[in-house]
């Protein structure tokens, strides 16, 4: 197994290439180049190899620890024996068994990233850890920090109206349209007379829009034409304000005074008695 920083997600015993899962790789040789077959014997035709996978499965769990147990040792809490993809006539030695501990990738701080098999005479220094020995082959593992994969954003459909609002857009700015003009095509951005941009009516209900739209977004707002000349011509606007007469409080009370005489007279009348 080459140096890698990708966490290992699965370990298993595999007896042949035909039984090897698609996501697994078999370790068929030690670091010295010798056979990594765990079935030893004279004229032995069967074989058992160690396989590993780095492809996330299910809950995207990674292997955070590996232990080798004797046949009388109780399986620790949180650990599980590695899988087996063997021919029915082949079995692995039970005197020593490999077990692994798995955790979700987003919660694990470190995970097993590399496994090596060697002969007994071979020694590795840090950061490799010696796990144990089975059938004359020594297990070594290297752990590394886990970096959770960045989520891949799903492609979104951006309407032409939103593209028109982008500062990076190379499209030409559309001519100014008045509010009385017919509605443009759905999804187009319309520049208004007040310098702001609005979306057409159909674009408001387009669920593919990447921005949140409120109930009033896209409603055009324009100033009535009779007031446009007044605002643009400062001299006319100033003259209109000079002719404006502001009434005093007494003038307002005198103009809108109402004594409620009719109502008071009607309330003072005595209703006819019932005969």
UniProtKB/Swiss-Prot annotation:
Keywords: Cytoplasm, Endosome, Membrane, Protein transport, SH3-binding, Transport
Membrane topology: Peripheral membrane protein
Protein's GO biological process: endosome to lysosome transport via multivesicular body sorting pathway; protein transport; receptor catabolic process; regulation of epidermal growth factor receptor signaling pathway; viral budding; virus maturation
GO terms assigned for molecular function: SH3 domain binding
Location of the UMA domain: 216-267
Cystines in this chain: none
UniProt KW Cell membrane keyword: no
Signal peptide (UniProt feature, chain positions): none
Gene3D superfamilies with a match to the protein in the record: 2.100.10.50
Location relative to the cell: Cytoplasm; Endosome; Late endosome membrane
All copies of domain MABP, residue ranges: 5-145
Oligomer status and interactors: Component of the ESCRT-I complex (endosomal sorting complex required for transport I).
Protein name: Multivesicular body subunit 12A
The organism of origin for this protein: Xenopus laevis
Gene: mvb12a
């Amino acid at each position: 197994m080459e140096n890698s920083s990708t966490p290992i997600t699965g370990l298993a015993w595999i007896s042949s290439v035909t039984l090897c899962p698609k996501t697994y790789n078999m370790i068929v040789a030690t670091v010295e180049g010798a056979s990594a077959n765990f079935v030893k014997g004279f004229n032995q035709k069967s074989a058992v190899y160690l396989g590993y996978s780095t492809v996330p499965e299910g809950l995207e769990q990674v292997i955070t620890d590996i232990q080798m147990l004797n046949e009388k040792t109780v399986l620790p809490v949180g650990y599980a024996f590695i899988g087996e993809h063997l021919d029915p006539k082949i079995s692995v030695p039970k005197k020593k068994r490999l077990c692994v501990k798995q955790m979700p990738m987003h919660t694990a701080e470190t995970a097993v990233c590399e496994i090596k098999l060697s002969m007994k005479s071979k020694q590795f220094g840090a950061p490799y850890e010696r796990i144990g020995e089975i059938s004359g082959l020594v297990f070594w593992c290297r752990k590394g920090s886990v970096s959770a994969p960045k989520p891949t954003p799903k492609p979104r459909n951006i309407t032409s109206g939103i593209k028109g609002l982008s500062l990076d857009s190379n499209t030409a700015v559309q001519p100014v349209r008045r509010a009385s003009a017919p509605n443009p095509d759905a999804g187009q951005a319309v520049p208004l007379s007040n310098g702001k941009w609005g979306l057409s009516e159909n674009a408001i209900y387009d669920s593919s829009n990447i921005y949140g739209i409120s109930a009033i977004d896209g409603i055009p707002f324009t100033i009535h034409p009779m007031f446009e000349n007044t605002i643009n011509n400062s001299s006319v606007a100033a003259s209109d304000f000079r002719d404006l007469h502001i009434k005093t409080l007494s003038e307002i009370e005198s103009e809108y005074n109402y004594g409620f005489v009719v109502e008071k007279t009607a309330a003072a009348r005595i209703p006819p008695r019932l005969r």
